[in-house]
Amino acid sequence: MTANTLKRKISLRIKRKRKIRANISGSAVCPRISIFKSNRTIYAQAIDDTNSKTLCASSGTALKIKANKDGAAILAKDFAEKLKAAKISEAIFDRNGYLYHGVVAAFADALRKNGIKL
């Protein structure tokens, strides 16, 4: 993959991200769950946009998991436990410009299985 192709893919993802963020917003009762994936790991955080605060976060580096579907399911289980400890049962899912496919879809499905309403 050439450098220009990579820059174009990243800029298109950022463009999709901005369009998504224009329409969704989280609150303390129903936070926005944002996911970020790199080649090595996955990160997730619950964000209260009205107060600009991160309510809770979970990372794949702390759990020593890879950025694949199995790792996404493990991360979602850990993240759901943190959300339940913070008394959050409902949230808005922000796919952060990524396609709702693969790791992102596996993370969202695992959150739903662990009792978080998206």
UniProtKB/Swiss-Prot annotation:
Stored PANTHER family: 39S RIBOSOMAL PROTEIN L18, MITOCHONDRIAL (PTHR12899), LARGE RIBOSOMAL SUBUNIT PROTEIN UL18M (PTHR12899:SF3)
MF GO annotations: 5S rRNA binding; structural constituent of ribosome
Keyword RNA-binding found: yes
Keyword Transport part of the UniProt annotation: no
Pfam families registered for this protein in UniProt: Ribosomal_L18p
One GO CC annotation: cytosolic large ribosomal subunit
GO biological process: translation
Family: Belongs to the universal ribosomal protein uL18 family.
Function, as annotated: This is one of the proteins that bind and probably mediate the attachment of the 5S RNA into the large ribosomal subunit, where it forms part of the central protuberance.
Assembly information from the UniProt record: Part of the 50S ribosomal subunit; part of the 5S rRNA/L5/L18/L25 subcomplex. Contacts the 5S and 23S rRNAs.
Protein name: Large ribosomal subunit protein uL18
HAMAP family assigned to the protein according to its UniProt record, in alphabetical order: Ribosomal_uL18_B
Record Gene3D superfamilies: 3.30.420.100
Alphabetically ordered keywords of this record: Ribonucleoprotein, Ribosomal protein, RNA-binding, rRNA-binding
Disulfide bond entries: none
